[in-house]
């Protein structure tokens, strides 16, 4: 079956955009094919710094014919309806339509629309130009004289050529007749800009990928990554060193080269006095190079791995020397930052934070630090931390933001603060908290274990959330400019991973009170936000979101650890036959109550009359007794936080509830008896509310 080959060659595409662009190209083209009724066997997208490529295998040469029957208005319908039907069906007159008879509704017009299958080549030529014109680059540009014209082509970098062919593997494929921005599709591409700048004639994918390989272009980004990684490991091993692997840097570097050549450079050993993290940040950020460790050690070696896009005639000596000069200059800067920063104590830097605005409505960083310190001191006893150490750590936690090193490398915030604090003799817990108070940064990041770190981390995140809630800067849809979802997830993970008992409303209130002179946060709304984040977090671990809703619907549910334990007990209960049947009985009772309360215009929320129930049917009396006992037992179990015991108490209701619905008529002719039986159903609803709001549970 025929294949499609598409290449869009341009000036250098930013590395961070390449992989997403390749996937976008595949999705746009395959979606367009499927929408037009064309199926295919497989599709692969590729990217290099200078091209996006797509190969779709197993396309039909021609689409299948389509026969569609479209029913129109009733015979004798108004003229406007008839004309609308004819226009929609593409018919010139009713003579081209037939009629069908519906035994119940009468005679109707019917249009039989037959569309012959179209040549795949024609269909591709129809939609490919529009895909190129509307391609979803995060940033794009116009260029050349045509850029002044309205609607001129936009691309991430100037587009230079298009290869677009379609045909069977065993025959010479045809060029798809497309032209975009004055660039007509053809069969000519180019290899490596410097190593093989000559034109290459290609026809089909197998020819294309082999021709590029000969022209010093590795088309597959994952293969380029593999080449870089293994060559770097081998080169390091040959020198008795270990590569410090960096997936993010590897991904970026593989997008900077079409023909990766791995080389090793070195720097003066005196630079190893600089913290290893600073050396790595310097070499990574400025030169896109990998650092190395001494063999079998955690200590850095005075060497680095660089990746060139050239096969140099001198074996890469000039390229390596050039990189070494730049690395030496950058490390000299880093050493200056390190020595300069060590000369000033962290607390002496705090006045500078008073001049840095955190947010125009939330004051300066200095004001924020004062709030975090007060909150950390208050939280400390609740998490087993020393209040004085927690307050001290919070006061110093942001001081490194005004150091030279963090000013140059913001990603080192916290880490450099920890090192400077250790040098000035701070307590180990204070040092750890300065680095760890930013954690956890995501669902898989490590959660701090030191109580002082936990206190400061909670204070930092709660202050952020309460502050932005107070000024109504909440996340909306996909927008979360202040990373409030991440902050809430951080609080949740700190509480759950460390088994902390905290009343969130109380802590939000404390954070709120520290925002003196500013409007307070809506604590209930913020608690709802925590509930949403908790649902996302637990759902990823297999928990049911409706059970979380059912627990949060109860009053006073701001102790997240207890919420989760209650959810776990509820899930275990509902997995049993007793749980499933009780839920079904609850749903039936709630449905009856809803109907009768709506009909009567009143709520049946009074306690049932025990004497009246005792005088009624045996099943009625048994349910009344079981409800009273189960509610009392469940309430006591919840009070001592024995949620499994509470569920066990509810499980005793299964048999009497089943018997009640089987043997008792709720809507009895006697009004008093009917009212009391409805009150019994309400008592069932009230009993289940001891553990959760069953109305929120699905199923």
UniProtKB/Swiss-Prot annotation:
- Which InterPro entries does this chain map to? DALR_anticod-bd, Gly-tRNA-synth_bsu, Gly-tRNA-synth_heterodimer
The compartments listed are: Cytoplasm
Molecular function GO labels: arginine-tRNA ligase activity; ATP binding; glycine-tRNA ligase activity
Listed Pfam families:
DALR_1, tRNA_synt_2f
Keyword Repressor present in the record's keywords: the answer is no
Give the family this protein belongs to, as stated in its UniProt record.
Belongs to the class-II aminoacyl-tRNA synthetase family.
**HAMAP family for the chain:** Gly_tRNA_synth_beta
Instruction: Check the record and name the PANTHER family matching this protein.
Output: GLYCINE--TRNA LIGASE, CHLOROPLASTIC_MITOCHONDRIAL 2, GLYCYL-TRNA SYNTHETASE
- Complex and partners: Tetramer of two alpha and two beta subunits.
> What name does UniProt use for this protein?
Glycine--tRNA ligase beta subunit
């Amino acid at each position: 079956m025929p294949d499609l080959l598409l290449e869009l060659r341009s000036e250098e595409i930013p590395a961070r955009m390449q992989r997403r662009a390749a996937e976008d190209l595949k999705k746009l083209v395959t979606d367009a094919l499927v929408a037009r009724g064309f199926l295919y066997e497989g599709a692969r997208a590729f990217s290099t710094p200078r091209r996006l490529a797509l190969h779709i295998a197993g396309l039909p040469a021609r689409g299948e014919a389509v026969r569609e029957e479209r029913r129109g208005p009733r015979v004798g319908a108004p003229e406007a309806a008839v004309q609308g039907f004819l226009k929609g069906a593409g018919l010139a007159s009713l003579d081209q339509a037939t009629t069908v008879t519906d035994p119940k509704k009468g005679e109707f017009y019917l249009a039989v629309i037959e569309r012959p299958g179209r040549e795949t080549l024609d269909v591709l030529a129809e939609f490919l130009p529009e895909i190129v014109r509307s391609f979803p680059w995060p940033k794009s540009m116009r260029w050349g004289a045509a850029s002044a014209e309205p609607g001129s082509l936009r691309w991430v970098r100037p587009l230079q050529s298009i290869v677009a062919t379609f045909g069977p593997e065993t025959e010479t494929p045809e060029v798809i007749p497309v032209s975009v921005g004055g660039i007509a599709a053809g069969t000519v591409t180019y290899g490596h800009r410097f190593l093989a700048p000559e034109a290459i004639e290609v026809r089909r994918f197998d020819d294309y990928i082999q021709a590029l390989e000969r022209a010093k272009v590795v088309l597959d980004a994952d293969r380029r990554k593999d080449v870089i990684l293994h060559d770097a490991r081998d080169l390091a091993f040959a020198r008795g060193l270990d590569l410090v692997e960096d997936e993010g840097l590897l991904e970026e570097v593989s997008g900077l080269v079409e023909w990766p050549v791995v080389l090793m450079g070195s720097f003066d050993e005196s630079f190893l006095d600089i913290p290893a993290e600073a050396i790595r940040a310097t070499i990574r950020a400025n030169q896109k190079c990998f650092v190395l460790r001494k063999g079998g050690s955690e200590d850095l070696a005075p060497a680095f791995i660089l990746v060139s896009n050239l096969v140099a005639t001198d074996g890469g000596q000039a390229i390596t020397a050039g990189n070494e000069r730049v690395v030496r200059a950058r490390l000299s800067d880093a050493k200056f930052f390190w020595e300069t920063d060590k000369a000033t104590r962290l607390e002496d830097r705090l006045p500078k934070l008073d001049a840095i605005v955190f947010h125009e409505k939330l004051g300066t960083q200095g004001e924020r630090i004062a709030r975090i310190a007060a909150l950390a001191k208050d939280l400390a006893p609740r998490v087993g931390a020393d209040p004085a150490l927690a307050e001290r750590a919070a006061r110093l936690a942001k001081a490194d933001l005004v150091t030279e090193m963090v000013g140059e490398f913001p990603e080192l915030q916290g880490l450099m603060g920890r090192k400077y604090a250790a040098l000035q003799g701070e307590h180990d817990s204070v040092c750890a908290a300065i680095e760890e108070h930013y954690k956890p940064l995501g669902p898989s990041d490590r959660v701090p274990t030191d109580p002082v770190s936990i206190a400061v981390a909670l204070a930092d995140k709660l202050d952020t959330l309460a502050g932005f809630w107070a000024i109504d800067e909440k996340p909306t849809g996909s927008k979360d400019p202040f990373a409030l979802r991440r902050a809430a997830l951080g609080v949740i993970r700190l509480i759950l991973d460390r088994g902390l008992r905290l009343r969130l409303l109380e802590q939000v209130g404390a954070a709120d009170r520290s925002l003196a002179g500013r409007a307070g946060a809506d604590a209930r709304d913020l608690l709802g936000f925590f509930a949403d984040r908790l649902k996302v977090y637990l759902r990823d671990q297999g928990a049911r979101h409706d059970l979380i809703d059912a627990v949060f619907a109860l009053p006073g549910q701001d102790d997240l650890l207890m919420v989760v334990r209650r959810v776990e007990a509820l899930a275990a209960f509902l997995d049993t036959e007793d749980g499933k049947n009780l839920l079904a009985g609850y749903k039936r009772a709630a449905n009856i109550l809803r109907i009768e309360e709506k009909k009567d215009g009143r709520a049946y929320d009074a306690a049932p009359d025990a004497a009246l129930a005792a005088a009624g049917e045996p099943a009625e009396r048994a349910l009344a007794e079981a409800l009273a006992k189960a509610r009392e037992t469940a309430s006591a179990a919840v009070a001592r936080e024995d949620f499994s015991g509470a569920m066990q108490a509810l499980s005793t209701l299964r048999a009497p509830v089943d018997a009640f619905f089987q043997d008792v008529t709720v809507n009895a002719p006697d009004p008093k008896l009917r009212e009391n039986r409805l009150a019994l159903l309400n008592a069932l609803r009230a009993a289940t509310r001891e553990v959760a709001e069953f109305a929120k549970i699905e199923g």
